[in-house]
Swiss-Prot record:
Substitution effect: residue 26 to A: Loss of activity. Decrease in iron and sulfide content
Gene Ontology cellular component terms for the protein in this record: anaerobic ribonucleoside-triphosphate reductase complex
Subunit relationships: Monomer or homodimer. Forms a tetramer composed of two NrdD and two NrdG subunits.
PANTHER family xrefs: ANAEROBIC RIBONUCLEOSIDE-TRIPHOSPHATE REDUCTASE-ACTIVATING PROTEIN (PTHR30352:SF2), PYRUVATE FORMATE-LYASE-ACTIVATING ENZYME (PTHR30352)
Protein name: Anaerobic ribonucleoside-triphosphate reductase-activating protein
Binding site for [4Fe-4S] cluster: 26, 30, 33
Disulfide topology: none
Its job: Activation of anaerobic ribonucleoside-triphosphate reductase under anaerobic conditions by generation of an organic free radical, using S-adenosylmethionine and reduced flavodoxin as cosubstrates to produce 5'-deoxy-adenosine.
UniProt entry tagged with the keyword Phosphoprotein: no
Organism: Escherichia coli (strain K12)
Cofactor needs: [4Fe-4S] cluster
């Protein structure tokens, strides 16, 4: 898996202070997407064990209390990303108790395959659905267009 950007302290992409990871790779290619540079799976830089360790360390850093992590992109549930995202989410669950995990995907919840559902079964919130420019609404919280749904899973 590749990623484009990692923010160790973020107050924009989810509730509270959190970490945010923007991964590479998206098959949806939504017109009007604000993150077109993340569409190609080989763009950005490789997601390494060192980066994974950094995220775990940041989530557990007591100097800056973080509520959790936001995983966006690109699409964290892109088939090529799922193995690494699953491993990361499993580590967060095991090593960062009490941290919430939010995932944004262009897929709809009812379209997800078994591998993608392994990730979803471990997260707190899934924001699903493609961005639809004609349904864009800047007043919406945590989503860009009114067709997208915020699923509070746990």
């Amino acid at each position: 898996m590749n990623y484009h950007q990692y923010y160790p302290v973020d107050i924009v992409n989810g509730p509270g202070t959190r970490c945010t990871l923007f991964v590479s790779g998206c098959v949806h290619e939504c017109p009007g997407c604000y993150n077109k540079s993340t569409w190609r799976v080989n763009s950005g830089q490789p997601f390494t064990k060192a980066m994974e360790d950094q995220i775990i360390n940041d989530l557990n850093d007591t100097r800056i209390k973080r509520q959790g992590i936001s995983l966006s992109g690109g699409d964290p549930l892109h088939p090529q990303n799922v193995p690494d995202i699953l491993k990361l989410v499993q580590r967060i669950r095991a090593e960062c108790p009490g941290k919430d995990i939010w995932v944004w995907t262009g897929y709809k919840l009812d379209e997800l395959n078994a591998a993608q559902m392994q990730v979803v079964d471990l997260i707190n919130v899934l924001v699903d659905g493609k961005f639809v420019q004609d349904l864009k609404d800047p007043s919406l919280i945590w989503r860009g267009s009114s067709n997208q749904v915020v699923h509070h899973l746990r």
